Amino acid sequence: MAKVSIKLTKSVIGTKPNQRKTVEALGLKKIGQVTEKEMTPQLRGMIDVVQHLVEVKEI
């Protein structure tokens, strides 16, 4: 599996509760915070839910 870098680029203020929980489940709390994860189908789905809040790059 490929590794991806996920960066929170926008605030979760004003977003739906499920989007906030998804961002938290990705391991992101603050704007600009970056986490690295293995790309899985589950992770792809989580990224799709919050694609307007995060930036994803393959490593």
Swiss-Prot record:
Pfam families: Ribosomal_L30. GO terms for biological process: translation. PROSITE patterns: RIBOSOMAL_L30. Disulfide bonds: none annotated. GO terms for cellular component: cytosolic large ribosomal subunit. Keywords: Ribonucleoprotein, Ribosomal protein. Belongs to the universal ribosomal protein uL30 family. Part of the 50S ribosomal subunit. NCBIfam families: rpmD_bact. This is Large ribosomal subunit protein uL30. It comes from Alkaliphilus oremlandii (strain OhILAs). The gene is rpmD.
